[in-house]
């Protein structure tokens, strides 16, 4: 990709357009970090929103349906307790209530009705993420979905399916180098085809809580699939602040950032190394591989 300014693939300032307005104790609107508006080549829509109490109204996300696969994830804001969410939530899938209190991800196949989301308990701040796959247009996804239309009754399950098959409550740990310090080891895999056979996506994440060593520890590498690389801070009072300063080299071009960022990596574009220049607060690093469902398919079974 000669003469490409790879900065066009980095989003360091979110849009505020999705996820409703006027909801108390929740970022409202949510932070949009990937869309066709932000990166025209990326047919994905990614939002993040801090939850800082029981949302009001509760529920504020109602049963809805759309024509695209979606990954929904709720993660702990505490790097010392990454698996304990800090809340108890009920999420309806296909009319079946799914209760959880750990960092949890959901794969929602296109056409599956989902919602409402109901908070039962709140202990500490946590993050809600939605990643819609195959469409980067907010209105096409949610415009007629019914997401913001209150329903009189709770949904009823009508299919003979246990929708727990689309839920990941505990991660796999298969990536990382035990000799690297300052970050979660192993990283936490919260989406793969091994965990959910229908999900041809691979999502893994790690907390960075001090300057990693060695630095860099992620070298240049390349995949035969698209990827989103996400770095997110841990401070709900300053939600766009990363808490660090990082440089990621994309296509040979250094991209440096100190705020949250989402970087779209097109198929076949070399990326890395990643070098940390500061770590002021803990922050989360997430890699989302799109169109592959296993570690071996993404990295050939070898760490970059």
Model segments located where?
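Short intrinsically disordered coil segments
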Residues: 63-64, 88-90, 144-150, 220-221, ...
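Double-stranded beta-helix
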Residues: 1-19, 117-174, 274-304
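Conserved metal-binding segment of the jelly-roll/cupin
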Residues: 93-120, 252-277
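Extracellular structured ligand-interaction cores
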Residues: 68-72, 86-88, 126-128, 200, ...
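Solvent-exposed interaction surfaces and binding hotspots enriched for charged
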Residues: 98-100, 170, 175-177, 193, ...
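A short glycine-rich, His/Asp/Glu-containing loop-to-beta-strand
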Residues: 26-70, 181-227
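A short beta-strand-loop-beta hairpin characteristic of the jelly-roll/cupin
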Residues: 74-101, 139-142, 231-258, 298-299
